[in-house]
Amino acid sequence: MKLIKPSFQIIEPTGYTIDDIYKSIELAGRCSHKSEDKITEISAKDFVGRMLNMKHLATCEFGTIYLYYKVDKPSTMVKEIIDFYKNNQYSKVECVNSYSDTYLERGMGRVYDIESEYFITTNLRVCLENNRQEYLTDALCEPTEYHYKRYTVKFICDRGILAEFTRHRRFSFMAESTRYCNYSKNKFNNQLTFIIPCWIKDLKEGNYYAYCEYHHAETDPCKEWFAACMNAEHVYTELIEKGWKPQEARTILPNSLKTELIMTGFDSDWQHFFKLRCAPNAHPQAKELADMLKDKFNK
């Protein structure tokens, strides 16, 4: 078995074109089956197409879309577009009004020309489910200082913390699936990987092959944890060898099993996440990751 510490990675988009959006979706979507090795320069569009054919639109939530409209006299169509995103709970709209130096004479008063700029942040699932994709061609843009930003983070944590983090329902989630991942395969080095709890201070990361490799007193409770993880790996492998499917053998896997979790949300969602998960009474393993991520966000 392999023991590692938890970690995270802030995933930056490769760009903001529709092809770049597809790449973000594929990267997140392949986390579930751990099929990232199938990603190529041209695989993203086909991957998204398959997801759409199977109605798996949840993956499209990871395709962040930034739109821009500049209007002086909004048409009925543009007004309808803006109103839709304003009322959509998964989108955010910022309006900036500018006043021109010239003015119009209207009766006895002077009324300055007003131009309104609309900065919209949404995701591809919203566009697809509401038949908005035809409006993307002209309005798609890179994020500006006025756009509400969305951020994507990949956590390497245990299954217990996965359950904690996915309670933040404002986010989009994609997690490594124990139903489909067969950890007895060469792809996973024929072993299970477990997360070292933060309260076990002297256990090093690495591969372990026998119970006796934990050199501590028999009364040390951490030795029991070590033995339980090793036993889980042994039983899991044995069940697979005897014909059980991964979705059946996974029933004996403990919370300490390593998993990968990708989360995408607005900056306000992450601030709420930090408020709860960095609190003194938060679960210590959740706080461990949240504190590290908050420090990175603040830099």
Describe every region a protein language model picked out.
Residues M1-K299:
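Family-specific signature for flavin-dependent thymidylate synthase
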